[in-house]
Amino acid sequence: MRNILLTIEYDGTNYFGWQKQPNKKTVQGVIEDAIKKITGEDVNLVGSGRTDRGVHALGQKANFKTESKIPTEKFPLALNSVLPNDISIKDAAEVSLDFSARYSAKQKTYKYLIYNHKFRPAILCNYVYHFPYELDLVSMQKSCEYFIGEYDFSSFCSSGSETNSKVRRIFDCYLTFENDCIAIYITANGFLYNMARIIAGTILDVGVGRFKPTDIPLIIESKDRTKAGKTLPPWGLYLVDVVY
């Protein structure tokens, strides 16, 4: 028995999120089907986290147990030969049998892309959030700094969260520019339900003057979802990396 860790890139546009669901096309389900095609095994693919419908990944991690004799380094090519073009296995590594892509994760990084131009994009419509109004980028960057630290992030969690504790540690949060877009990067030891999208929405609200950067600690302290910004759409969000 071996435990194989995959690094996965996918376009989430045509999927009902990561997690397998009855009668719905999901990333987990499609990859499990691909593994069965090349190994003949029914496996349980454990992802580092469940991305929602429309969310993309550049570096999702997932592991599965196998009795297959396929060399570890051959798994990416073998799987990619039977996977659709919007899912790609970038790497495979053998890990200890007690390793879990979900529970062994130390930190994750997400980014949110905002297309801040007058006219909406056509080609990028499923990959960025279009926001045509002027933004105060200096204040947005300043607001990012107030998220860094360990706090109860109840204000940045949608209802329906399955976790009891809302305490998370954000290691880094900053603004940069990528391919004509504003990119908000957030690295944390874990994320609550919609946490990254709500933080991005709150930072955007700072950019239009609804909040001041110094309001962020007050919003965190309130532990009240209604005090924070809106939840931005899923298609601008990317799971960038997972560290173990």
Swiss-Prot record:
The molecular function GO annotations come to:
RNA binding; tRNA pseudouridine(38-40) synthase activity
Name the active site residues: D52
Q: Which EC numbers characterise this protein's activity in its record?
A: 5.4.99.12
Q: Which GO terms describe its biological process?
A: tRNA pseudouridine synthesis
Q: So what does this thing catalyse?
A: uridine(38/39/40) in tRNA = pseudouridine(38/39/40) in tRNA
User: Which SUPFAM superfamilies does the annotation name?
Assistant: Pseudouridine synthase
Cross-referenced InterPro entries, in alphabetical order? PsdUridine_synth_cat_dom_sf, PsdUridine_synth_TruA, PsdUridine_synth_TruA_a/b_dom, PsdUridine_synth_TruA_C, TruA/RsuA/RluB/E/F_N
Q: Which residues bind substrate?
A: Y110
- Origin, by domain of life? Bacteria
Enzyme's top EC category: isomerase
> Assembly state and interactors?
Homodimer.
> What does this gene product do?
Formation of pseudouridine at positions 38, 39 and 40 in the anticodon stem and loop of transfer RNAs.
Describe the family membership recorded for this protein in Swiss-Prot or TrEMBL. Answer: Belongs to the tRNA pseudouridine synthase TruA family.
Provide the protein name: tRNA pseudouridine synthase A
Species of origin: Caldicellulosiruptor saccharolyticus (strain ATCC 43494 / DSM 8903 / Tp8T 6331)
